[in-house]
Amino acid sequence: MASSSGSKAEFIVGGKYKLVRKIGSGSFGDIYLAINITNGEEVAVKLESQKARHPQLLYESKLYKILQGGVGIPHIRWYGQGKDYNVLVMDLLGPSLEDLFNFCSRRFTMKTVLMLADQMISRIEYVHTKNFIHRDIKPDNFLMGIGRHCNKLFLIDFGLAKKYRDNRTRQHIPYREDKNLTGTARYASINAHLGIEQSRRDDMESLGYVLMYFNRTSLPWQGLKAATKKQKYEKISEKKMSTPVEVLCKGFPAEFAMYLNYCRGLRFEEAPDYMYLRQLFRILFRTLNHQYDYTFDWTMLKQKAAQQAASSSGQGQQAQTPTGF
């Protein structure tokens, strides 16, 4: 246990979950690996200080409850208070797509990008069917599962999610134009930059930027220098608007430009045609003669790393791979 988090030592929450170590941080609060002391099972625990200026873990826990049972939505074990924290106990998952992108030397093959795109579209669609938009679609918020779920992609971090329509009446939230940017500027839709209320189309457009980030290794509006955060957002917005989709997607299959143009063309209240978007990439996948065998780029690397470790140590130990493998 690192001395810096000494206060968390022997910290047991929900009567049976013992904190082990910090494994990450979400939009609000830190994530810890914990063990269920009754059966030895590993879980993830999200902690938020009760003194937080804008507490949102209770909100996030309610959202997870609404989404429970969806494919690729982590299962919630417990929500409550412990010491001076709000506590959310959930399934332990594997590394994020950002972790895996780095693990693969920031290069994904087209096969991997297309297999991911299929699952990512489905995860966002599911959240939308439950009347919410995510509003922070980025590689860090998509995690691979572990064990028998190791090929399944999970969507996490619903701290910024918002209800976009009424459950009963299906009444859509009204169009507004005075909003501050919510989410991560790098992947934000153009309309989000312009202060327009977000809706389903914005989650889909953000996904388009995530896919091109994987294809290109970086986006043209990354690494822009500015004195203030506001000025940086301005610069990102300007660069995004002045980069034609065709330029952004140059050198890659036309389907990526088709995807982005489709998303940008959606009206505020319009439901995206998720099946059309999945089919776009599925047909491309087949055209490229790939097999949908869940062999991702990191699957190969993990196997190589494990083999090297086994041969060098004479034992079948796992080599150092991102946390959660």
Curated annotation (Swiss-Prot):
CDD domains: STKc_CK1_alpha. Its EC number is 2.7.11.1. The keyword Metal-binding does not apply. SUPFAM superfamilies: Protein kinase-like (PK-like) (SSF56112). PROSITE patterns: PROTEIN_KINASE_ATP, PROTEIN_KINASE_DOM, PROTEIN_KINASE_ST. GO terms for cellular component: beta-catenin destruction complex; centrosome; ciliary basal body; cytoplasm; cytosol; keratin filament; kinetochore; mRNA cleavage and polyadenylation specificity factor complex. It holds the Pfam family Pkinase. The modification Phosphoserine is found at residue 4. The modification N6-acetyllysine is found at residue 8. Phosphorylated by MTOR in response to mitogenic stimulation, leading to its activation. The modification N-acetylalanine is found at residue 2. Interacts with the Axin complex. Interacts with TUT1, leading to TUT1 phosphorylation. Interacts with FAM83A, FAM83B, FAM83C, FAM83D, FAM83E, FAM83F, FAM83G and FAM83H (via DUF1669). Interaction with FAM83H recruits CSNK1A1 to keratin filaments. Casein kinases are operationally defined by their preferential utilization of acidic proteins such as caseins as substrates. Can phosphorylate a large number of proteins. Participates in Wnt signaling. Phosphorylates CTNNB1 at 'Ser-45'. May phosphorylate PER1 and PER2. May play a role in segregating chromosomes during mitosis. May play a role in keratin cytoskeleton disassembly and thereby, it may regulate epithelial cell migration. Acts as a positive regulator of mTORC1 and mTORC2 signaling in response to nutrients by mediating phosphorylation of DEPTOR inhibitor. This is Casein kinase I isoform alpha. The gene is Csnk1a1.
